[in-house]
Amino acid sequence: SGPDIVTHHTCLYPMAGQTISASRAVEVFMAAGVPAEKLVLGAAFYGRGWSGLDSSRHPVGQTGKPGVSFRYPACAKAIAEGSQKRCWDDEAKAPYLWDGDTFVGYDDPESLYHKVSFVVSRDLAGIMFWEWSQDEDNELLTAIYETYQGHRFPR
């Protein structure tokens, strides 16, 4: 998929017909001999997306105009104000915003729960994120911390 093809930004698992995902990257590195304790999974504290999409079709897989970017607080605000609808892709374990024209993939507390659980279950070194300043209320950092509670940290 090229830069104009709509796909999830940082999905944990691939959707049907897709091959790119965080879990797949971990599998590839481990198959190449990289030890789990050397791998860190990534998360995004911002959203990335496309505009100019067809509202009659599911957004993922469409061709659109890339370049849409939201800080995490803007994602939450758009949902609260009703200008964007939060959707959940249960296969990819990824949220996205969708208004019929614009798709924005991002991470939220629910997707981070699944990512941290994956990190713990695979004994990975941990999780990283970009960019902390885009989590103004520490909602995402708190979700990561709270999910780790009760789990031991990898070596």
Regions from the PLM with identified roles:
Residues 1-78:
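Substrate-binding surface in catalytic domains of secreted glycosidases
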Residues 13-16, 100-107, 128-129:
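Active-site rim elements
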Residues 18-26, 108, 112-115, 140, ...:
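Stable alpha-helical elements in mature extracytoplasmic
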Residues 25-35, 115-122, 147-150:
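Structured segments of extracytoplasmic/periplasmic soluble domains
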Residues 41, 119, 127:
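Conserved, mostly hydrophobic/aromatic
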Residues 43, 131-133:
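Active-site proximal loops enriched in glycine and acidic residues that flank catalytic Cys/His/Asp
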Residues 66-123:
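Hydrophobic, secondary-structure "cap" segments at the distal end of domains
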Residues 77, 81, 118, 133-155:
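Aromatic-rich peripheral "rim/lid" segments of glycoside hydrolase catalytic domains that contact
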